[in-house]
């Protein structure tokens, strides 16, 4: 048995270890490639350039190699935002691939611009898209540069791409059943849904809408509505589509925030998207605001600028209304409400009179309609009091005075609803819940009036009410009238929207009603399930004998579950604790049946009270909190809809005066009858070209004004968006990475500069060392004798002329003696070009003229150094080596005169003894060895003023036609041959 058990010993040390190996091995990088990618990562420009240049020659590395993270050198440079390296890599034609997409995702604008302007080589191999999708690319095939740029919402990148002429595929409708959509969904439903989501995410980009749409408001409205509808179909991506819809709504609101004047606001809100140049249109009907309400753009409608314009129109006749005391407001409204019949009669008689125009104002119209409805409710209250109680037993009672007074209001309400449905359309009428409530209320009143007429005609005798039939017309009419009264009173809640305190509460109540309807659906299902079970259990135990009262409304409840309807009532009232537990008992000794019945009844109460009722409370609390969080937006949107209903033309007169035909209505009716019903139809008089032209010019002017305002709004919005993005960006990990990359790049740049400076210094030192070595070697070779170097022969005067031809010319002029013949030498061999050394040039080729700072009188006494003819006397004196210090602003150098082909060492000696001849020349000495003999050569360096230098230049013309070049410095003048 021991062999079935694992025993650990020293012979099996690895039995408890899991061996690991790389399953998906990748190709390893060579050391050169690793160094190449590492240099790109660190931003070492010089090393990367060297690697690329060597790769072109020796092919040591693959410039398109990939690191373990799947990044090429170009992608690494893009990730580090190193534009210099990106430009360098592109210049060597590295493989681009998806680099543009990576640059867009990284939002490197400079890299995107470089990649867009980069022309791919004609011979570059293109990778098949299927391979890019599965192996090489991080992006799906439906992701294009413009779609990815729109996802990032980078305005600058989107602008660069749009300027290149890119396009976005147009998405099909939500419920499109075309062949393309059906086939794409059947082949790969996930890719089809993802592709649709990516396209809509790109189209919902605020930067793309602002840049490419002629009417950004209309585009945002339609796209938001379409995304909201799409979220109901694509339930899997509901949250994404709802977020995109909110993004479009917020963009429209932010764009409207940029308006700065009432003129701009009116141009935007009054613009029509379906403008026709030849149709006459009103320019002050708030068409764009109506469109926003239709698309439920609550953020746009509740925007402060929009609300300010609406408030100014609402209180047109009362500019200081909001600043008045509340008591003054109440008194004013009460007086206007009492006078609404007078205003209505004046409008009927003279619509253009001051009082007739006064009632057409939106605020006055609202007060008059409210006063009329309050009067109607007061009449309903009077009708419910039954002041006259003499005909209570009449089966068909005639209408009372109050009921006759109520009738015109009911007819006025019905006429108003018909007119509203005719003007706005059936679809818009149904979408408003208050209209549905009005429809139910008016239907109840019509049914009540009809039943009362039937009862008045059919039943005229007196009969005690207890003996009436259950479905008597009068009884049914009274029940319907009572229900209609409830609806009429609740209809007053709609007026709470105009108040800032009651408006949010009314909106919360409306949202809670939706939750109650959802709860009732689940509750009814539970109620029906338990009612069916209890009725099936207690159906056999129904009691009928000896009962004067049957049901749960009796003093002693019985037969609570005998029928399905009675069971439903019993379960409903049990929620409120109105059903006793003994209703589950039966007369027979069937304890098991009683136990099952009581258990079912108790389970129902637990589910309905503990679970469902608490769920309803939680739902209502959630709805109220949702409205409370957005109370301002919700209330302003509801108030705007109320205000817009009074801004409309028509519906001026309140009920019941709206049923009275006005002269204007009679004229319209006669005109309609004459046009449509008469045999001889009126022919429409054609309009003149002048009228059409003026109308077209007005509409075109409105369009141009709108486009101008939109251009300004877009500019302000983009500037604000960029400014807010920079403000909210803050310090992130990416910022520290970029800073680290910049420091690394700067480090390598500085190292490169220092390395180059050090190299140039070493090269110059080597050059000077080589020149000194060559001079020493020349001296050694010349000291051996003239037998080894017979190429060039110099005389004493040739040497003098070579060193200082200018001084020699001056000296020969003044001494009237010849200073030697012209120098005839062979052209020296070409040497490598070296850097100009000012001091060396002075020592080798130039004259050094001391520029005196003394006055003109002292300049004549300056010492002048020249070559003396007493060479023989100095030869006997022996070698004398002395140094001259050139005093030129602190410049001191040792003058080692080195002449090619001349084996000598000449040292300029400054005679401090101040030996001056009659010509003002100071004697200096130069020791020159010739054939192991030292010859003392007296040298002259003329020190002449800078002002006299130009005049003395002419003296050298007779001596040499090739004038020396003269360079003037601050304190001295240098003359070079």
UniProtKB/Swiss-Prot annotation:
Region described as PDZ-binding domain: 975-977
Ranges of the Extracellular topological domain: 384-403, 454-475, 535-599
Keywords for this protein: ANK repeat, Calcium, Calcium channel, Calcium transport, Cell membrane, Coiled coil, Disulfide bond, Ion channel, Ion transport, Membrane, Phosphoprotein, Repeat, Transmembrane, Transmembrane helix, Transport
Any Pfam family the entry gives: Ank
Binding site for Zn(2+): 172, 176, 178, 181
Subcellular location(s) of the protein: Cell membrane
One Gene Ontology term of the molecular function aspect: cadherin binding
Annotated control of activity: May be operated by a phosphatidylinositol second messenger system activated by receptor tyrosine kinases or G-protein coupled receptors. May be activated by intracellular calcium store depletion. Inhibited by xanthine-based inhibitor Pico145.
Described function: Forms a receptor-activated non-selective calcium permeant cation channel. Acts as a cell-cell contact-dependent endothelial calcium entry channel. Forms a homomeric ion channel or a heteromeric ion channel with TRPC1; the heteromeric ion channel has reduced calcium permeability compared to the homomeric channel. Also permeable to monovalent ions including sodium, lithium and cesium ions.
UniProt-recorded name of the protein: Short transient receptor potential channel 4
Originating organism: Homo sapiens
Gene: TRPC4
